[in-house]
């Protein structure tokens, strides 16, 4: 039971993490960031990600991996809200730093938690293979949700102006798509919330006392 609850929670919250990462390029472009700036932003996340990941690991020794993963989930929920209100490049750079603070830590400690919850340690290689597949398949729901919400919002904005995709000019469509983008990003919080409910609400109830100390 703990393993099943954890896998479903992980699938949800890590989907949100991967979606925010994959959508960052289009969001930065909408704010006027060129390809060189985007490359620099991605590099910044990687450079800052390593020391913050090590910090997560160090704090996990004191507070436990479960607590630190929970902290990372909360950080990414805040990132969704912050991204929704973001409208300038300096805020985008702040967003990159925020992502860097938790990206490596939440991924590394999620894997560590999975290893500690394994009921059969002898089959750890096989189980970690399945875990990696879960991680790679987890970026499916998020992009789909972002696309649906963005399209719905854009169509609503067009209708409010008495327009359709067929009657609007290319400039109008581009402007409305850019305006609808933040709503798509905000929708990612729904997936992370599902993971958070399972992680904070369901998982502790099915864990043993020893497992709660992880």
List where the protein language model places each region.
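Multi-pass alpha-helical transporter architecture, strongest
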Residues: 183-214
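Intracellular juxtamembrane helix-capping segments at the cytosolic ends
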Residues: 105-119
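Short amphipathic helix-loop junctions that connect adjacent transmembrane helices
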Residues: 19-38
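Helix-loop junctions at membrane interfaces in 12-TM secondary transporters
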Residues: 84-96
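Structural signature of the two symmetry-related core transmembrane helices
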Residues: 67-82
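Loop-to-transmembrane helix entry/capping segments in MFS-fold secondary transporters
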Residues: 35-36, 120-131, 181
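A membrane-interface helix-boundary motif in multi-pass transporters
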Residues: 150-192
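Helix-to-loop junctions at the C-terminal end of transmembrane segments
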Residues: 51-65, 150
């Amino acid at each position: 039971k703990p393993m099943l609850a954890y896998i479903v929670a992980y699938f949800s919250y890590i989907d949100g993490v991967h979606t925010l990462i994959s959508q960052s390029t289009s969001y930065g472009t909408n704010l006027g960031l060129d390809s060189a700036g985007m490359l620099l932003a991605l590099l910044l996340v990687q450079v800052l990600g390593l020391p913050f990941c090590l910090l997560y690991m160090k704090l996990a020794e004191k507070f436990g991996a479960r607590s630190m993963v929970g902290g990372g989930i909360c950080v990414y929920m805040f990132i969704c809200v912050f991204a929704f209100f973001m409208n300038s490049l300096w805020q985008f750079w702040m967003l990159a730093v925020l992502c860097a603070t938790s990206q490596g830590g939440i991924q590394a400690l999620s894997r560590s938690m999975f290893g500690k919850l394994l009921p059969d340690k002898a089959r750890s290689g096989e189980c970690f293979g399945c875990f990696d597949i879960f991680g790679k398949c987890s970026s499916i729901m998020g992009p789909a949700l972002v696309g649906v919400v963005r399209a719905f919002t854009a169509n609503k904005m067009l209708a409010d102006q008495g327009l359709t995709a067929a009657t609007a000019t290319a400039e109008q469509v581009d402007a409305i798509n850019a305006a609808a983008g933040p709503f798509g990003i905000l929708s990612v919080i729904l997936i992370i919330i599902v993971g958070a409910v399972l992680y904070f609400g369901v998982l502790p109830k099915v864990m043993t006392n020893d497992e709660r100390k992880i």
